């Protein structure tokens, strides 16, 4: 590429810690161009509240993007109403959606190489009459992507999910031959294309205790999971399992694994967040562009206090940059 790929950053809920983290991220010089999609006055006000210096420049497509310390480029998107740190206002729900819309369009057009998302308050968006179930679903719907996979990563561990935000009683029915096949196809493809792993080794959790104990503790492994894994192994993929989730997460298995596929949200993510909370990143696999996100919420009580932890945003930005560079290399090789 002739110039460094631009990373788009949506700070998320304006009353939360997303603007704080954006201001904090701008304090250090960067080796990649970063553009915040938000109201520039919001960042100026939050910087003043935090007592941090900040110069804001208007982003103009095709022009150089600042990478200097204490300086950030902003694609201006106006708030619906003035924002007070820590106080939700549904008037600003449409503003949050507009930042995501602009990020999606920029990524699809190639203007941005990746988008990093700050935390949003789903409840206040829905209270404003906007049907919104989350970033992942929004990006999938607005890029015509029929299925995506949620993966969280921290140092030494990547965990993808076969199902995401479902009640536990609905998980078994959601794990079908078709859905598990689609999940594995997306996971393996993105580990190869976006992470540069030519032959990824993936550990697959069973659904039931002891991975079903040969059918005595549930039949999902025998009826669905094992047959799907056998089909992938027959095509040369390096999949191990199904393994009992209570023993899979130890060095004996993880030392040479590239990722773990958990069957449901609270099977895999508690381990990952115990290992790396505050320094983990959420990556959406299967999209036609790169999207990473922080692993925490809006933390309204911390907004404007200077007590927010920037660790997860730093990791999310780092992942976005590395994945963008990997994608650029692949594109150059492909011609």
Swiss-Prot record:
The annotated pathway is: Cofactor biosynthesis; pyridoxine 5'-phosphate biosynthesis; pyridoxine 5'-phosphate from D-erythrose 4-phosphate: step 4/5
Residue positions binding substrate: 135-136, 273, 282, 291
- Recite the UniProt cofactor note for this protein: Binds 1 divalent metal cation per subunit. Can use ions such as Zn(2+), Mg(2+) or Co(2+).
Its organism's taxonomic lineage begins at:
Bacteria, Pseudomonadati, Pseudomonadota, Gammaproteobacteria, Cellvibrionales
Q: What is this protein called?
A: 4-hydroxythreonine-4-phosphate dehydrogenase
Q: What does the miscellaneous comment read?
A: The active site is located at the dimer interface.
One cellular component term (GO) for this entry is: cytoplasm
List, alphabetically, the Pfam families matched. Answer: PdxA (PF04166)
């Amino acid at each position: 590429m002739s110039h460094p790929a631009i990373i788009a950053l949506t700070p998320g809920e304006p009353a939360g810690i997303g603007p704080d983290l954006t201001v904090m991220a701008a304090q250090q010089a960067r080796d990649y161009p970063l553009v915040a999609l938000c109201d520039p006055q919001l960042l100026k006000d939050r910087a003043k509240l935090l007592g941090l210096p900040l110069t804001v420049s208007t982003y103009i497509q095709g022009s150089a993007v600042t990478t200097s310390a204490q300086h950030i480029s902003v694609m201006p998107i106006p708030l619906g109403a003035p924002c007070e740190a820590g106080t939700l206002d549904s008037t600003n729900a449409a503003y949050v959606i507009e930042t995501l819309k602009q990020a999606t369009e920029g990524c699809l057009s190639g203007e941005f190489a990746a988008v990093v998302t700050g935390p949003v308050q789903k409840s206040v968006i829905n209270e404003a009459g906007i049907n919104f179930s989350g970033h992942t679903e929004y990006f999938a719907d607005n890029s015509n992507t029929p299925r995506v996979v949620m993966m969280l990563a921290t140092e030494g561990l990547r965990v993808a999910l076969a199902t995401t935000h479902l009640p536990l009683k609905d998980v078994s029915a959601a794990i079908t031959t078709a859905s598990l096949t689609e999940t594995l196809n997306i996971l393996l493809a993105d580990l190869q294309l976006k992470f540069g792993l030519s032959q990824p080794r993936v550990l697959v959790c069973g659904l039931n205790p002891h991975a079903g104990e040969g059918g005595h503790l549930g039949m999902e492994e025998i009826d669905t999971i094992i047959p799907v894994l056998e089909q992938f192994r027959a095509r040369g993929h390096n999949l191990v399992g199904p393994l009992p989730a209570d023993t899979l997460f130890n060095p004996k298995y993880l030392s040479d694994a590239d990722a773990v596929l958990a069957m449901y949200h609270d099977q895999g993510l508690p381990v990952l967040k115990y290992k790396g909370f505050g320094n983990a990143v959420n990556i959406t696999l299967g999209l036609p562009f790169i999207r990473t996100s922080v692993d925490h919420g809006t933390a309204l009580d911390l907004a404007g206090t200077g007590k927010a932890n920037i660790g997860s945003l730093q990791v999310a930005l780092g992942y976005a940059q590395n994945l963008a560079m990997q994608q650029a290399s692949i594109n150059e090789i492909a011609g």
